[in-house]
């Protein structure tokens, strides 16, 4: 075998090895890296600290921390902002709503005078900002519970179209109007 044949054979082997390496990178490394970046991004943008980075959310994070769902309960369990304020019925809905809400909040924070937002009026539309699927993620045994049985039975049977926060209005943010006043927002 002359040197040209050996060189040609080596080039073919290197070509095959290159294809295998690129295939492994494309099939294993890139998806794993994308998953890790995505997972870390979701985790980093899901806690109360991230939400309170925007000054306008401070009264809501504080009033949440002062509530049963913020950890003021016998078990010390605390819900995150995303537990209640994002849908948990599917990963797709969670992802798209997280993206939509995030873009909206950044836009409002950057290009609006947030001191002019009537936060009290927004609390009257809490059904638009809280998802029953979030409530039911934690309260998995609610359908079998005996407290409020008639109302909950009607809810699960679809007889009423109320949402959880229709009846449980201040459950996630205790004394929210007080916190809004302390942060100099219009109640």
Task: Walk through the language-model features, giving the residues of each.
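Short sequence/structural segments immediately N-terminal
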Residues: 2-187
């Amino acid at each position: 075998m002359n040197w040209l044949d050996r060189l040609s054979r080596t080039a073919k082997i290197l070509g095959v090895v290159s294809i295998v390496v690129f295939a492994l990178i494309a099939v294993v490394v890139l998806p794993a890296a994308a998953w890790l970046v995505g997972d870390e991004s979701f985790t980093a943008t899901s806690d109360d600290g991230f939400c309170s980075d925007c000054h306008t959310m401070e009264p809501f994070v504080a009033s949440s921390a002062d509530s049963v769902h913020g950890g003021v309960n016998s078990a010390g369990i605390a819900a995150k902002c995303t537990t209640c304020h994002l849908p948990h019925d599917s990963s797709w809905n969670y992802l798209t709503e997280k993206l939509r809400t995030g873009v909206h909040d950044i836009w409002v924070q950057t290009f609006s005078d947030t001191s002019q937002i009537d936060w009290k009026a927004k609390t009257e539309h809490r059904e638009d900002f809280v998802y029953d699927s979030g409530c039911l993620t934690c309260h998995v045994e609610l359908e079998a519970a005996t407290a409020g049985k008639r109302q909950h039975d009607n809810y699960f049977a679809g007889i009423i179209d109320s949402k959880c926060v229709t009846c449980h209005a201040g459950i996630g943010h205790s004394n929210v109007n007080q916190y809004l006043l302390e942060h100099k927002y219009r109640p």
